[in-house]
A protein has these predicted regions:
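N-terminal accessory beta-strand-rich subdomains and adjacent acidic, glycine-rich linkers
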Residues: 1-112
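Long, charged amphipathic helices and adjacent flexible linkers at domain junctions
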Residues: 108-123, 128
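Aromatic-lined carbohydrate-binding/catalytic grooves of carbohydrate-active enzymes
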Residues: 121-225
């Protein structure tokens, strides 16, 4: 939702300390001239090429200048460098447009397509995706997934994504997140067997991960509490 806040000498901060960004705490913001509109007016946009905990602040100085800080969240963060070592921070990007909010959106869109998207996907239509989550959530077998794959192909889908539940003892959202070994009870032929059968239907095969999270009830957490 579009929210506007005046820039004053009081610092305005946006941050995430949860290890994630996403739509809950996007590390992006705009600085807009008072007369900026959708198609006219000066707008500066900022974003961070990083999906972890982040911090940004905007403040007007005593001289009337706008100061922006943007980067990794300092909360609970430290990194010791030995002599000769280096630490590379996430890249912060800034864009400017005199064509309003629509102009800055287009500017960032061009940047993402030209500089961030893998070369194979530049200016290429994305495949139509079927995701297994709404169809079966954690309750599936290989046979059920293949039935869904057949229906997805009939609907014109091109990529079948197997969502949560394929690993560990993941029968609910209370355990196993982080234990990315195949659940042989659900997938006796493994991911390779399922993928080959979906490929034979003419579907690409994709897989869901949530690498930024871990369940307390998991082997990974017990090994690294």
């Amino acid at each position: 939702q579009h929210t506007e806040t005046p820039i004053t000498m009081a610092r305005t901060c946006l941050e995430s300390t949860t290890g994630a960004s996403s739509s809950r705490a996007n590390p992006g913001f705009l600085l807009a001239a008072p007369d900026a509109a959708e198609t006219a007016g000066e707008v500066c946009g900022f974003n961070l090429l990083y999906s972890g905990s982040h911090y940004l602040s905007v403040q007007k100085s005593l001289q009337g200048l706008t100061r922006v800080m943007h980067g990794i969240s300092p909360a609970n963060f430290n990194w010791e460098l030995a002599p000769g070592e280096r630490f590379e921070t996430p890249e912060a990007v800034m864009a400017w447009s005199d064509a309003g909010f629509g102009g800055i959106t287009d500017c960032f869109g061009r940047y993402v397509n030209e500089a961030l998207i893998p070369p194979y996907w530049k200016n290429r239509p994305r495949p139509i995706v079927y995701n297994s989550w709404e169809g079966c959530m954690f309750d599936f077998t290989e046979a059920k997934l293949l039935r869904l794959g057949k229906l997805a192909k009939q609907l014109g889908c091109e990529l079948f994504v197997l969502d949560d539940g394929w690993f560990g003892k993941r029968d609910s959202d209370t355990s196993s997140l982080g234990d990315y070994s195949v659940n042989a009870k659900k997938l006796p032929n493994g991911l390779k067997g399922l993928g080959e059968k979906l490929n034979a239907m003419g579907l690409q095969f994709g897989l869901w991960f949530e690498p930024e999270s871990v369940s307390p009830d998991s082997a990974l957490y017990r090994q690294h509490p």
